[in-house]
């Protein structure tokens, strides 16, 4: 097991500043680096630190960051989820690490979960200087995920999304929707999503539980599955067979389209199980084995 340090890292993205934690093994002169960020509306303290710690103990550097508008990063309105800007944040972090002398910029690995799992697949299809990708329960097809949304609630959600988008154009305060709610209109309306999301929240960090509704329409249109055929680096893809937010058929199709570069796992779990107990241990063990196979510690 490697000893490591954790240092704050701040990187400019557009007019704002991204806040990150930089985990650096003490025993590795120029380690490979794993870049990590959360999925929909998540802070880096929401069960991602446990992954980062295990990677660092195994000898890998880790950069775990919050998107603009979130957590320790700057930007207003707070808690805005912009797919376009979050993808820009991933590119910014990768470009920053390419110039950083303390890590091996030839060995950059992307790690994403849920929505950020879709991001890292998208980025891997675009960037040619990334060496591997790990995507757990990735969001791969918004159009297919939308079919799991309660049909009677969809028109209202789309209307609020449109109103918030137009309001944002003229400087109005955001119209928000809860991320999860057991009874009211929200982004993730299933019962297991409500319980699952509540299980990853860290009460020591501010989180309102609501985000601007303008995201809803863009989320439906976001389809990383359309780009994954362009990926030609090793991909670890972990899917949840009983995921109520991401159709398992979409995960299977995406993995098929990445072949022969994909190592696909389909486990008998729900979307949020992977952050907890035995599923977390299985996930981190699988991810470390994948890293050992394709990246390694020198």
Predicted feature locations:
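N-terminal cap/lid segment of alpha/beta-hydrolase-fold proteins
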Residues: 1-29, 83, 277
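Catalytic nucleophile-loop/oxyanion-hole region of alpha/beta-hydrolase
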Residues: 14, 44, 70-105, 277-283
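Conserved alpha/beta-hydrolase "acid-adjacent" motif
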Residues: 244-250
